[in-house]
Amino acid sequence: VQVTILSSNLANGATIGEWGFSALVEVDGNCILFDAGRYPDTVIKNAKVLNVDLSCVTDVVLSHFHFDHNDGLLPLIQTLHDQTAAEIRRIHVAEGFFSPRRPVINPGTFPTCMDGELECNLMIGLREEIASEGVEFIVHSKAAEIFPSVWISGPVERHHPEINYPTGTSASKLEVQLAGDWVDDFIPESQALVIRTQNGPIVLLGCGHS
């Protein structure tokens, strides 16, 4: 098992840091990209500096809809398809990933709701454009084994009334539409990637909202 961090808020001078996350996961010849970072070129540039070959990637797992985990997805797919032999075929998301979001407090402070935008989930609008690259979105309602010994958790049942948004006078707050009702956005689609090894499971999280 090899896990290489390609986007985070840490950098060593040669790599680029950002408010975002992405990791390449290599397991028994299978390559999975877990999240895609915030900016279009971060993952590509860091992979080059680290001598990481992204042409092996066939599957992407997105932990949740937030911009710092997937804004770089479409340009990344386009670049890999144009410049490498990569054939990204599937994107795995959990149920709730494409649910509408709306701002209810300080909408201008949430980056994807700027300029009066009422829909804060930009992945809804990008879904068809990404699919036009020949990539299939697979929406999971429960845990699934996507490769031998590689699992995604799917949506995680919540047992406690969590607050998954900042609090304070300047903080933003979103609601999510589920079954026709608007409720506080608890990020229902937040999921993990789990790798089973002889020494126990390896668990990768995005923000760990669930």
Whereabouts are the PLM-identified features?
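Active-site environment of divalent metal-dependent phosphoester hydrolases
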Residues: 41, 66-70, 98-100, 144-145, ...
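Active-site metal-binding loops of divalent metal-dependent hydrolases
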Residues: 8-10, 36-38, 65, 95-97, ...
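Short acidic low-complexity segments
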Residues: 53, 137-146
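Short glycine-rich or small-residue beta-strand-to-loop segments that form or flank ligand, phosphate
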Residues: 33, 59-63, 94, 202-205
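Conserved beta-strand hairpin/beta-sheet module of binuclear metal-dependent hydrolase folds
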Residues: 2-50, 186, 190-209
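Hydrophobic alpha-helical segments and helix pairs
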Residues: 84, 88-140
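Active-site-proximal loop/helix segment associated with metal-binding centers of metalloenzymes
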Residues: 105-124, 142-197
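Active-site metal-binding motif and surrounding structural segment of the metallo-beta-lactamase
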Residues: 41-93
